[in-house]
Amino acid sequence: ETMFRQFAEQRRLNAAFSHDLRTPLTLLKGHATMLLSFIPKGLVSQQEILDEISVMSKNISRLEKYVNAMTNLYRLEDIDIPRQQITFHSLIDNFNNTAEALCYDKHFSITTSGNNITLFINLDTVMQIYENLLSNSIRYAKSDIAISVVIENDNLVISVSDDGCGFKNIEIEKATLPFYKSSKDISTEHLGLGLNISKILSERHGGNIQIANNKAGGACVTVKINCNES
């Protein structure tokens, strides 16, 4: 079952990658064809040629980003995730410092529940997941972001909510797919990998990710991560 799931994930990743490469490749082909046709006939000025080259350069940069992202995604499946000891309070300090740095134009609050117990986690992995959730929330929040961190049954549970427009039903189903972008993000530069990476890393750390909407409106993404010693 595990091998079948990994194979299915690999096929989805390859399909998403191929789909996202198609647009910049099509644009490159179109601009190259135009230049090859018009330059010999003297139908374009030097400035128009430079403008076309500039557009082509931007699409080459997009291709490079996708290739690098794809390489990093493949590596996530194989990286070792050793656990270290860290106190709950120390982790919250890390979370608070990160939120203060990232939420410079948004208001955030962090609520916690749990004694200052010792957690057994990979801090780099947990911080990457947290930063992805927070960055995603910042992108859509109108003004407020609510962060909840609790310990439940040997799991570290991190929830990040915002007061934005929330997820559409189809987005709830597809938000963790690689390179997925909502209709609001089509024209943006981000690759649509944050929640997918968070899903992979949380599963590698013995947990999972849940995508939902708050009853009062806005999105809520929750990650559970195993934090016991075994």
Regions found by a protein language model. Give the residues of each.
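Conserved micro-motifs of the catalytic ATP-binding
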Residues: 77-82, 114, 118-121
